[in-house]
Amino acid sequence: MRFSLELSHHLWTRDRDGQAPQRTLDVARAADAADIDAIWASEDPEGWDAFAILSAIAAVTERARLGISVTSPYPRHPNSLAASVATLDRLSGGRAILGLGRGQVEWHRDALGIDIGDPLAVLGETVALLRQWWQAPHRAISPVDGCFQIRGWERVIHPVRDDVPIYLAAAGPRALDLAGATCEGVIFNAQTSTDFLRQALPRVRAAAMAAGRDPAGFSFVLQTTTAVVDTPDAERKAIDRGKNLLALVSTLPGMDRLVRTESFDVPALLDKVRATMRTRDTLAAGGGFPALRRNGDLTAARALIPDDLIRRLGIIGPLPVVREQLRTLDELGVTHVAVAPPEDATSVESWRRLLADLGQ
């Protein structure tokens, strides 16, 4: 199992002294020097430009793979995606990974005015178009009844590699099948349950084999952040962060299936949390995460969510507990897991100790 650093724009929203951009680069530089496997930058419609962030990180790192987790062909047309990935791959010396997903279609359709069509068909065609642009003769053509109607468009800037890996963010059965048949990996959202993973990973492998592909080299990336905590106060903070995440993300349409577990009545719980967070009303009005935070009551939502559910969905605890949780995920076939930065996140030695403790 390998570990990754997950970067989010949220740190920048709390930037009071203008140092957040430099700190982002410093943390990435330290993690890379400590031999972290990958650095991922999230991309939400209201946030930063993940390709710009990773291009800057490419200039201060040497080893780590650099991935988007995840972008969507709705706000980023496939031609723009092809250009951005090729540019990042060139700047990084062949280290780019594309994390691709449909995103929250309600935001694209209702707030940004984008025609979404059939999201799965859009994703499948996007993957096919990107492969055509990245491989000689670098000319892409959509199917006759395609979603984009690309008519022989040729690109002149290509990635270092013609097989840049594409990882699909997948939750539903059809998306898992598409990932296995056409991509190199799957990205599972933070707090995906082991119950879900036990069903999903074999399905992806079966889809790969059915498409004549070898699933042995497939990557399964879990975005759940590994948090080693040694005090009750540190655990409390980690659990509350997990509750916030559950209230804001797992209540969105299509996300609840990832967090279902036999130990809890998750559908009933999420219905209560949605009501407290006013999730449906906010989405219907075209609101994104800023509106969800304003309109919902996170304090009340946290009170509804059992601590033990977050412990079950997370990777939280003292080092021996975390190691056991990681061992379980490794046995399931998860290949990559996110890790919370050490307290001194700009220290190479702190990163090395953390990764060594976790077993990398």
Region annotations inferred by a language model:
Residues 117-157, 197-202, 206-328:
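An alpha-helical appendage that flanks or caps ligand/catalytic pockets
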Residues 4-22, 69-78, 160-171, 226-230, ...:
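Active-site mouth loops of central-metabolism enzymes
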Residues 17-31, 81-84, 170-178, 242, ...:
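Short, acidic/polar
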Residues 35, 57, 88, 130, ...:
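Conserved, mostly hydrophobic/aromatic
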Residues 3-9, 39-41, 66-69, 96-100, ...:
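Hydrophobic faces of well-ordered beta-strands that scaffold small-molecule active sites
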Residues 51-71, 75, 122, 126, ...:
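Alpha-helix-loop-beta-strand connector modules within alpha/beta enzyme cores
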Residues 1-3, 36-38, 61-66, 90-97, ...:
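Short, well-ordered coil/turn segments that N-cap beta-strands
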Residues 1-66, 164:
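N-terminal beta1-alpha1-beta2 module of alpha/beta enzyme domains
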